[in-house]
Regions:
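Alpha-helical membrane-inserting segments
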Residues: 16, 20-32, 55-59, 63, ...
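Membrane-interfacial helix-loop-helix connectors in multipass membrane proteins
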Residues: 34-37, 178-202, 278
Length: 290
């Protein structure tokens, strides 16, 4: 997905989250708890921010397999229909055994060369590869890609990212409401409840803080890719992993849902590189000693 589309989707998602949080806060009277004295009860606000911040993150994690299957139209390999599917299924399960994790669901989806892993725990994951990847890579390279995804599962990357996202969500909700309260009370001199200025300020602050916080999340995401590459090299071979990365680098960037740990192509640099979930292919190859 183009970076511009990702940012637009991110902003729209935050606006919807803000609307939902605001409605729930009003319905159950939460805002009355953290503004009961006319000022802000920071402890109460932090508690409620944490509840909503982590709830959203873990609900997304629990639904990740469901969302990924439908978003990518994944065909689960229950009974292999041909030798290729049989090999992919057996190779994935063999790599899972090597890594000490439960056998994941295995699937195939249409598209440019890519693969992803998702799921809420190490023993209930989904690993899927694209038809483009199967067609353009040799067996050693495909196996290295499968090993990369199994490494994500073994490292618990999805759960760790959910925890980090929960912390980030808490920070964004908490800080945005502090900014909104300051604007409403200090700048606009509104002494009765929270007016329009508060909600507008919260929306703007959530967008700004959300983008800044995403830089931290994406930085960690890039680190996990290096670790998964190294794990794949151990499960297969360094040469196979480097070969897979080089083959992937010749493909165009695929469109992947945000809920998955994708093998990933991110070639663009500059400031936008801070919002990329994957390091450049060349950097990943260098990290493997290639």
């Amino acid at each position: 997905m183009a970076i511009g589309k990702r940012i637009i989707l991110f902003i729209l998602t935050n606006l919807l989250v803000l609307l939902l949080v605001g409605i729930v806060f009003r319905m159950v009277g939460f805002s009355g708890y953290y503004t009961a004295t006319g000022g802000l009860d920071l402890t109460a606000l932090l508690v409620f921010s944490g509840i909503f911040g982590f709830a959203g993150s873990f609900i997304s994690l629990l639904l990740s397999k469901f969302i990924a299957k439908r978003a990518m139209r994944v065909q689960i390999i229950d009974t292999p229909r041909n030798p290729t599917e049989e090999w992919i299924l057996s190779a994935t399960h063999r790599l899972a055994d090597q890594a000490g994790v439960g056998k994941p669901e295995v699937g195939i989806f249409d598209g440019e060369p890519n693969a992803f892993a998702t799921g809420w725990n190490r023993n209930n994951a989904l690993v899927a590869v694209s038809t483009g990847l199967i067609q353009r890579m040799n067996k050693d390279e495909v196996e290295a890609v499968l090993a990369h995804e199994i490494a994500h599962v073994a490292n618990g990357d999805m759960v760790t990212l959910a925890l980090i996202q929960g912390v980030v969500n808490t920070f964004v909700i908490f800080m945005a409401r502090i900014v909104g309260h300051f604007v409403d009370r200090v700048l606009l001199k509104n002494e009765r409840g929270h007016g329009l200025g508060y909600w507008v300020s919260v929306i703007v602050a959530e967008i700004v803080f959300g983008l800044l916080a995403s830089i931290v999340v994406m930085w960690f995401s890039r680190l996990r890719e290096y670790r998964a590459d190294a794990g794949a090299a151990e499960l297969t071979s360094k040469g196979a992993m480097i070969g897979a990365l080089r083959a992937l680098g010749q493909s165009k960037e695929p469109d992947m849902p945000e809920q998955v740990a994708a093998f990933g192509i991110n070639a663009k640099g500059g400031l936008m590189a801070l919002l990329r979930s994957h390091p450049p292919i060349a950097d990943r190859i260098r990290a493997l000693g290639g």
